[in-house]
A protein has these predicted regions:
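Flexible "arm" and connector segments at domain edges
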Residues: 2-83, 87-128
Length: 128
């Protein structure tokens, strides 16, 4: 069953032929969203996002502690997996909130560009 689902998703999206866009990723991530109340449960992906973000932080902490801030190939591969999990939870949380990833990404860059133009990238506060 697992192999069939993977084959179905991989067939739908030809990973070797084109770069993946945010909304395409979100659509494919939704196909793997198997949790209680999927489609009307924003709590699960929100908590998952916190957990996976913590795993990224934990790996970074160990790189600082054990490897003198040097990220080798093994650490990079582990971080890539964890960052992928973070991305999955972001995509599914956004979908639960009826938001699309392309719009989120675009609005975020617009916000940051505006802050940069006004010289307020540094500082604190959501509405600077």
């Amino acid at each position: 069953m697992r192999e069939y689902i993977c084959e179905q998703i991989c067939t739908e999206y030809n990973f070797n032929q084109k770069p993946m866009e945010f909304n395409e990723y979100q659509k494919l991530a939704r196909k793997t969203a198997i949790y209680a109340g999927a489609g009307k449960n924003f709590v699960y992906p929100a908590l998952g996002l916190c957990g996976e973000s913590g795993e990224v932080a934990e790996k970074i902490k160990k790189i600082v502690r054990d490897s003198n801030n040097i990220v080798d190939g093994k650490c990079r591969a582990e971080l890539e997996k964890e960052l992928g999990d973070v991305l999955w939870y972001i995509a599914n949380l956004a979908a639960e909130l009826d938001l699309d990833m392309e719009s989120i990404a675009r609005r975020n860059i617009e916000k940051l560009a505006d802050r940069q133009e006004r010289g307020v990238l540094h500082g604190s506060g959501d509405n600077r």
